[in-house]
């Protein structure tokens, strides 16, 4: 399960160790332009990487690039990666990028802990339609108390907080606590494997898509602003993709 959680935390991309460097915008602009052009090529292919970018809006990406071109924030490859991730999320207007998340990251093994995710959502949002038909036995409750994927999620995410500090500060309020992240993964798993209707899953998935985009882009902007005031600092960014059904 821990290995699965680590894969989920691909959703949580870490960018670290920002080295001393002067702004090299024109070099980066060429690389970022190449990145956008490369996506155009990938959209015509059927590779694993192409699946991630099938939904990328090229015009949106070019406009996002223009917004950053007079900035002193993009100073090296780490910041460049922030741009790529943020623009990919901001400019993905369809569902392919979100489908990639579950197809490539969340594996069916998570289904083994489904009752624990149902129990967690029942405790956090008892009126959620995702658990309307869920039946959790006493035996399952006891099993979840002893060993739950929720505990693994909290353990890994708490370790991340030990490194980057409080999530609410790091993300400029986009995420208020580890519990927000755990709740997001919980809903994602129940949308993928739960027993609720397809209509309910569709509505809940749209909510998660917007939630993830808001988190990713708000956090990216937060990181960009930090680069302006503390370009020598060590920073991280977490982003992720959610599937479509």
Swiss-Prot record:
Position of the signal peptide: 1-16
Keyword Signal: yes
GO CC annotations on file: extracellular region
PTM sites of type Phosphoserine: 33, 40, 92-93, 115
Tissues in which the UniProt entry reports expression: Salivary gland.
InterPro entries membership: DUF5442
Chief location of this protein within or outside the cell: secreted
Keyword match Glycoprotein: no
Keyword terms of this UniProt record: Phosphoprotein, Secreted, Signal
Locations listed in the record: Secreted
One Pfam assignment: DUF5442
Lineage: superkingdom: Eukaryota
Protein task: Used by the larvae to construct a supramolecular structure, the larval tube.
Protein name: Balbiani ring A 28 kDa protein
Protein source organism: Chironomus thummi thummi
């Amino acid at each position: 399960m821990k290995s699965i959680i680590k894969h989920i935390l691909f959703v949580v991309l870490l960018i670290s160790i920002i080295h001393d460097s002067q702004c090299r915008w024109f070099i980066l602009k060429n690389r970022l332009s190449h990145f956008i052009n490369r996506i155009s090529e990938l959209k015509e292919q059927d590779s694993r990487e192409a699946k991630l970018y099938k939904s990328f809006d090229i015009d949106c990406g070019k406009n996002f690039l223009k917004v950053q071109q007079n900035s002193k924030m993009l100073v090296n490859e780490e910041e460049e990666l922030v741009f790529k991730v943020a623009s990919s999320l901001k400019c993905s207007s369809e569902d392919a990028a979100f489908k990639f998340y579950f197809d490539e990251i969340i594996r069916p093994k998570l289904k083994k802990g489904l009752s624990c995710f149902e129990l967690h959502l029942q405790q956090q949002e008892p009126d959620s339609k995702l658990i309307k038909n869920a039946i959790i036995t006493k035996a399952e409750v006891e099993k979840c108390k002893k060993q739950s994927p929720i505990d693994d999620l909290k353990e890994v995410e708490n370790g991340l907080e030990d490194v980057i500090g409080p999530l609410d500060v790091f993300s400029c309020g986009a995420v208020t606590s580890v519990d927000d992240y755990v709740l997001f993964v919980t809903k994602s798993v129940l949308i993928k494997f739960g027993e609720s209707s397809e209509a309910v899953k569709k509505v809940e998935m749209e909510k998660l898509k917007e939630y993830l985009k808001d988190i990713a882009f708000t956090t990216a902007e937060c990181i960009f602003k930090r680069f302006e005031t503390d370009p020598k600092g060590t920073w991280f960014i977490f982003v992720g993709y959610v599937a479509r059904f």
